[in-house]
């Protein structure tokens, strides 16, 4: 599975999501991720809204296999439910 994390510098939830993705990529052969710095890439929240299909107020915004998962807390819950993380 391939995960994309859209985040920004200085965001503690972005750091937390990236750390979780890094942990998963080391523990699982089937998990890869890419972190995209929205400021460095010139991506706005309005751009993300077009992909997500609803208003985006916060980052990170996380997608797994092109399916929108949500923010950091949503990603942690998804990992727990789908990858038996923290079990």
From Swiss-Prot:
Keywords: Deoxyribonucleotide synthesis, Disulfide bond, Electron transport, Redox-active center, Transport. One of its GO terms (cellular component) is cytoplasm. Residues 1-87 form the Glutaredoxin domain. GO terms for biological process: cell redox homeostasis; cellular response to oxidative stress; deoxyribonucleotide biosynthetic process. One of its GO terms (molecular function) is protein-disulfide reductase activity. Gene3D superfamilies: Glutaredoxin. Disulfide bonds join 11-14. The disulfide bond functions as an electron carrier in the glutathione-dependent synthesis of deoxyribonucleotides by the enzyme ribonucleotide reductase. In addition, it is also involved in reducing some disulfides in a coupled system with glutathione reductase. Monomer. Belongs to the glutaredoxin family. This is Glutaredoxin 1. It comes from Salmonella typhimurium (strain LT2 / SGSC1412 / ATCC 700720).
């Amino acid at each position: 599975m391939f995960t994309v994390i859209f985040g920004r510098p200085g965001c503690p939830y972005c750091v937390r999501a990236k750390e979780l993705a890094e942990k998963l990529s080391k523990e699982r052969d089937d998990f890869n991720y890419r972190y995209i710095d929205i400021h460095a890439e010139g991506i706005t929240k309005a751009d993300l809204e077009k992909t997500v299909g609803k208003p985006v107020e916060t980052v990170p915004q996380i997608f797994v296999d092109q399916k929108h998962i949500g923010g950091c807390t949503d990603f942690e819950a998804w990992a727990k439910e789908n990858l038996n993380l923290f079990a």
